[in-house]
Swiss-Prot record:
The keyword Ligase does not apply. The gene is CTXN3. It is found in: Membrane. It is a single-pass membrane protein. The chain crosses the membrane at residues 29-49. GO terms for cellular component: membrane. Keywords: Membrane, Transmembrane, Transmembrane helix. This is Cortexin-3. Belongs to the cortexin family.
Amino acid sequence: MDGGQPIPSSLVPLGNESADSSMSLEQKMTFVFVILLFIFLGILIVRCFRILLDPYRSMPTSTWADGLEGLEKGQFDHALA
């Protein structure tokens, strides 16, 4: 049919190109970005499981009102002056 001539394909890299240059810079940057997103996702999953297993470890023992001196809880008049 074609007379024995090979069909050019953009999916197959040419013989004179190395394996590194088969990916463009944009593809390499996208690949690195996706890998970084997977690492970030893994860190978040580990952190969520740690919070689920021991939820009271990450909570502070004091409340916001413990630091107020001379003021009753909920009274904010002249607190910044």
